[in-house]
A protein has these predicted regions:
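Hydrophobic anchor at the beta1->P-loop junction of P-loop NTPases
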Residues: 12, 125
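Post-Walker A helix-loop "phosphate-sensing" segment adjacent to the P-loop in P-loop NTPases
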Residues: 29-39
Length: 237
């Protein structure tokens, strides 16, 4: 596929709460240190703006752009409904894809008008949750998708008498039926599959300081076609 510009698009997929925002935060830090210009995009940003406007017009005071953990869980079903219904009612189910595509194209146009090169510009899309979003990354921008899973260590009993203890990985389950259906479809199209242990950190900014998580992100980035060859230049922490 021949692109009209040299911008690199990387999408991050995985269940809600698997750490996609943390992944993007760490990736941004790594790429910036390696002299790349990073743009952060999310399909959910457009969704949240629409939901916020609807709530405001209906007299609600909830700010969906600044939610506590409890508020996120309470409002998540509304986000899922709003996002899915917009897809259902749009041509080809591309409502959110088209919004983010327009946003990215505007950024590129502004850069070109300003005489900026897009050669070392990386667009990180933090919430690729549907197959048509992954297809957009691949087909429209010749980009790649990284799929992320989160797990926790748990002791389990086993053996013949049930007295033996084993430390096992327990992966996060889907938070809702929609993600249980869509995430496996996205995962099979992902170019890089990675996983990490949940650290229980309060924010992405705090979690991004974890060296073990930084190494996971670094390895994933260097496994994409954009950085894995020495001739191109692998990334470093």
């Amino acid at each position: 596929m021949q692109k009209s510009n040299n911008i690199t698009v990387l999408g991050v997929s995985g269940y809600a709460r698997c750490g996609k925002n943390t992944f993007v935060e760490i990736a941004k830090n790594i790429l910036t240190k390696n002299n790349y210009t990073v743009i952060e995009l999310a399909f959910a940003n457009k969704l949240k703006s629409e939901v916020q406007e609807m709530l405001r017009k209906s007299g609600f005071s909830l700010d969906v752009l600044h939610l506590s953990a409890d508020e996120k869980e309470r409002v998540r079903p509304l986000f899922v409904f709003w996002g899915c219904q917009r897809r259902f009612e749009s041509e080809g189910g591309l409502y959110w894809v088209n919004r983010v595509d327009d946003q990215l194209q505007d950024i590129i146009n502004d850069a070109q008008i300003g005489g900026m090169s897009t050669d070392r510009m990386i667009a990180l899309v933090s919430d690729v949750r549907f197959p048509n979003e992954a297809k957009w990354v691949h087909d429209k921008w010749d980009g790649q998708v990284i799929h992320l899973k989160k797990w926790q260590s748990e002791w389990r009993k086993g053996g013949q008498d049930g007295s033996d203890e084993f430390l096992v990985k327990v992966y996060d389950s889907a938070p809702n039926e929609e993600e249980a259906k869509q995430d496996p479809l996205v995962e099979v199209t992902a170019d890089v599959k990675t996983e990490w242990e949940g650290k229980g950190k309060a924010t992405a900014a705090i979690a991004s300081a974890e060296v073990s998580l930084q190494k996971v992100v670094l390895d994933a980035l260097n496994s994409t076609k954009f950085f894995k060859h020495q001739s191109i230049g692998t990334l470093t922490l």
